[in-house]
């Protein structure tokens, strides 16, 4: 904190700056803004004696444009637009000062504590309310600041009143003692604004001549010109020296509060030719509120005493804080014309115009191979640029699709089109100049980059990788240097996209727990004409890769399932390789996903090139299998040819998979995260869930395999709302939300994977159910463990982050290892905090296992017992023994000290290199002491001492009187002082060299200590990851137990029976409820229902595998079908279900054809979507599948729809014989299958009151009860009445329906009679049926 005296000094300096030097400093958070300007105190006594100009009387005239009580937007220099009320000055009784363009209006700023001031009429705009389009994003008055939003609320309230009432809001009546000084400043500002042309000419003097002072301000300090911010001088790269305490030019130019990074402006750089390099003050706009300014001035009502003029030295220091001459350049991003010029400079460049752009290979935009990620920048243009801007264009030309965050000192600068993006998307403001320029501090990078990435932008972080001293040394070592060499090196250290976020130390922490996959896909047809996919996808925050290759059907069913289970946020594909069907999936199902095409060969590598790069780059050197001698991970090795021991030849059915991996590796390499992710060697082979689902496989053998999973494709997950709802895409109302009470992020991710692929093996399912029962049997432990789990951080991501920091590969040649960060200490502290957080997390895991081991012996579940049993105690235990390792890390270094200082000093015995260096230092120092004692005895003088520092240490200082004797010849005179001489010997030089070497080794070990510490921790990664996996499973099991205990209404343990070949599959649910719906729309309790398929119910119904469901519109048919689907998923997940009885044989796949929607982005109509989904069912369904079909055929003509529905029912019921719920409103279909043994009829019951020919008189009460038999009508006119269809239309429709019914019935009677005449049927039943049909006419 600043002392009161320092603050007082700075306040007085501010007054002088404001009244005399026209300096514009931010007033918000004064202490933070001025914390780096304390050096002003050295000359403040000289500054505060500057005479203050006398007040100039104002010419008062009434404009007539505005009147008291008007509401306006007002803008003062350095402040955002602010809602104001115009009212008469409390002492002058007028609203206007001056006349013409120099007139100023008196306003009160709306705020919690209102303030007032005079504002130039040029900077007033009528206030039209907070709903005005100029207030919205992109408008002139748009702001994200809560203060301005609050001010708009007050202004909106004032708008509803008349002017008389509004004037009662004017509460600022006391005149300010410093008001006249403020007015003088505003006069100068207005004069400057009106004379921009003169100032701009002076500013753009390319020869750097002295600035000509204004005649009216002779006392104003003469200054060298400060050039526009589009210039980059060699000195601009000298401003950042983290190890130098004295403020640099960059720091001196930045009087901003970095915590308010949204509106921070970046500093300007002078060009190389400027004779005096004066960095201009970093202007802060849209930050301070007028109220703060006024309150600051009121605190200092007395003006400084008049005294001698300020000295030249003081003036030169004050120029460091000079504001740009024209604040009009800070204008809205969307209108270049409001910035004092027609367009931004980059908008005028011909080679940047649409239609004229070329890529780096000079291919135009209409060329088929045009690369939009690169840009051709003419060489003659680059030669005209300053060194810094030339480097920016070089980087931009290779990353044209990225927003370049260009490090200058401690700020990230955005230039040209990137600056416009920053203003539009981040709310930054432009700097002065004719070209777009904005920026933010280093500390704000994580927050701002996350916003841009979330909006789909690609970010390129460019760091300064050379200090000014290093640059000078490089230039000296180079024979011929140009001005382009005399600039510090800057390199791209990271490219961040939505699919490549790793949440490093400089990035912000993740806000979401779910996986974000980067998917790479390659496609081709095999020799049989079948579609084949090669895929590779990775969650970069965890570092786990999935690689696989599979064949697919014409509907791309497996690929659709993949993207549903592992939803990518970014997709890479080979340009010109994808089929139309795959492109439709990318444009339809993955429309919100970022998609990027890679060029075949150079970017999307072949399988052979991929293997070659993986071996050459030595990504897996640390993980090399010493026994087999294999460098490649086992999963990658399995994809190579068995005949090639080197692993350079792809396997027969693995070329596409390895090529897709190559696309991923290329992209990770481009984003500069290939080393940290691939060196984890965390690969898993992707095998489609339905890979072995074949109709010829014995059902008992199939379900006996523990690795079998239920297949839930993307359509089913969407229709049943398992992961996200169909309304807004969130988890609200989904099965995931209902059962997810996981406490850890990695547990939540695992639960989602379990939901996407429930178990099929009854033994495994029952073991999970046993685990749920075991946990429910120890409620006290359940509560205790829950509290422990809540303390765990996201250890899965932390382990990946620790590996990245400790990676030797990254430390050797990654640009980030050379980057110079201003906030290095802050980042070091964050690294240590993350590491200590991981250690604490594993300690908590140990406590969890200790607590569970006390009751583990009573557990029936094998999986639960294995999770909480240590390997060392039982051979079946899975949890690693971490106690010894954790104790080792507890004593490795002082945790509290490291957390405070950001520096790790290892304790003895932990770091061999550091310990050896310390031991050598100690040994040499002891040798020095021994040698000194020896020399004392030799000379007979006890007063001989060592003297010196650094490399001149250990000079023996001998009294001059003693040197007159014969000294040994080996003594070499090094220095003298009065009465003494100092000597070295060869022995001393040798020992000193040893000491310096040991000290250098110690310092190097200490400097690299954190990385090596993380690296050593990562060596035990297998145990750490195993522990995380065990606790993740425990967390999910506890989540299932919580639902099983706290679910609404009665819940039961499902009974899963292994199917018998002689018996049909069945599903039996008694009094079952929808798991996500506890109340009806009207607030009543949910009505439970029985669903029996494939077995007889209590009423003795048939064992039909297909149930035809009818009932009134809105009667609950779709809900019943969704309920059945969700309950079987829960049962095979290993969770209790909301029912009194749940018995079933395992279901291998759930199919759904629910709802009605088109795929407009894929060019598919509603009916086509229906038939596509139905086709997939008919192709892939087995007798062990569950099929849910809702109103098939409604998307086409009635007869066509009826025919298709009838054929599908017959196929499902008589051929496939799978468990089916088929809802329909085609009552002819019901009649056709009423006598079929393979089909059972059921309907949602309803009660009809006042049934009559007039539908308006009927009252339908939905009972939501599923009962045996068919429903006679669909009562569609009741739904029409509930939807407020006009009564007249309903009546007409009812009459028309009667006509259709009669015609249809007549036709059916005619056909029946024809059959009787032909002798096809003529029994008593036929006669009875004919009689019934006639009664309906």
Swiss-Prot record:
Return the SUPFAM superfamilies for the record.
DNA repair protein MutS, domain I, DNA repair protein MutS, domain II, DNA repair protein MutS, domain III, P-loop containing nucleoside triphosphate hydrolases, Tudor/PWWP/MBT
Lineage, broadest ranks:
Eukaryota, Metazoa, Chordata, Craniata, Vertebrata
Could you confirm whether the keyword Zinc-finger appears in this record? no
Q: Which GO terms describe its biological process?
A: mismatch repair; mitotic G2 DNA damage checkpoint signaling; negative regulation of DNA endoreduplication; positive regulation of B cell proliferation
Q: Where is this region: Disordered?
A: 170-310
The species this protein belongs to is Gallus gallus
The molecular function terms of the Gene Ontology recorded here are:
ATP binding; ATP-dependent DNA damage sensor activity; mismatched DNA binding
Q: Which GO terms describe its cellular component?
A: MutSalpha complex; nucleus
Q: Which UniProt keywords apply?
A: ATP-binding, DNA damage, DNA-binding, Nucleotide-binding, Nucleus
Q: Where in the cell is it found?
A: Nucleus
Question: What is the name attached to this protein's record?
Answer: DNA mismatch repair protein Msh6
Entries under NCBIfam families matching the protein:
PRK05399.1 (NF003810)
**What biological function has been recorded for the protein in this entry?**
Component of the post-replicative DNA mismatch repair system (MMR). Involved in B cell growth by positively regulating B cell proliferation and controlling replication efficiency. Controls cell cycle to prevent re-replication and defects in DNA damage-induced G2 checkpoint. Doesn't seem to counteract or control the immunoglobulin gene conversion (Ig GC) and to contribute to guanine/uracil mismatch repair.
